Swiss-Prot record:
Entry function: Catalyzes the reduction of the glycolytic intermediate dihydroxyacetone phosphate (DHAP) to sn-glycerol 3-phosphate (G3P), the key precursor for phospholipid synthesis.
Residues bound to NADPH: S11, W12, R32, R33, K106, A142, R257, V281, E283
Main localization of the protein described in the UniProt heading: cytoplasm
GO molecular function term, any single one: glycerol-3-phosphate dehydrogenase [NAD(P)+] activity
Name by which UniProt lists this protein: Glycerol-3-phosphate dehydrogenase [NAD(P)+]
Gene (name only): gpsA
Amino acid sequence: MQKIAVIGAGSWGSALAMVLADNGHDVRLVGRRQEQMDELNERHTNESYLPNIELPTTIRGYTGMEEALGGVEAIVLVVPTKAMRETVRKIVPYLQKAVPVIHASKGIEPATHKRISEMIAEEDASTNRISSITVLSGPSHAEEVALRQPTTVTVASADDEAAKYTQNLFMNQQFRVYTNPDLIGVEIGGALKNIIALACGVTNGLGYGDNTKAAIMTRGLAEISRLGTTMGAKPLTFSGLSGLGDLIVTCTSVHSRNWRAGRMIGEGLSMDEVLEKMGMVVEGIRTTQAAYELSEKLEIDMPVTKALYSVLFNGIDPYQAAEELMGRVKRHEVESLYRS
């Protein structure tokens, strides 16, 4: 049994805390709202994020970092990209020794275009309280993980031993974990699939069917691969769990908040209206901005991302964006997979 702190008490953080508790670990789940943590400690539920689910009694809720982090042997970060730097700055002073950090967030920082592991490393550069950084990613709706339905994910780190440690920490009969040495590819695939899920949602809102969805997913994976390999990822990673696997589950399920947000946009709602209705973070919106800017900087052809960016940030009508996508210059399919 190990003492593990899970920072972020939303649906995904709570589901991962359940996996760790099922594996016999002492789990401290850290949230911002005292009433939410009181509910967890008294009734062992988190109805706002995982309705009708009973959490293991070995999960304890905390709002204070100092109390939650005392004596922990590993930290799992499950917070939005925009909160990642601040969260790392808050936890580092309370670490009594260097510990491994596992993050299960998906995004790219718009201001710097940094991946999440890069952000974490930068915030720990002066203290060296983090011994290793691992990402956990893959096709994994929190609702299904909490119901203990069979799920497979991948973990990646620059440190192979850290990846194996994370695999052992999480793996059980319902939650199968693979390792992958391609940290860049796993992070890029997990982040950029949210863009394609948004785009698939938009096409659904416009009334288009499965043909359109399949086209967006397939060509979307091609541009994810182009950007990822340019940034140093291995092409094969994008055909795995953190690439194709995550893309399928996020683009085809009503559980996906990015897909649902995209559908509302396709139906004519403004971005502000969508965010108000969702009531939760839609990572794909910020990631669309970051990926578009990266593609311009690196001169990578990403037409789906560009079209979605024009809808989200330039006010282009979704029908017009779809027409422009279909009217692009003739191309060879395979030759354009890994180059612009």
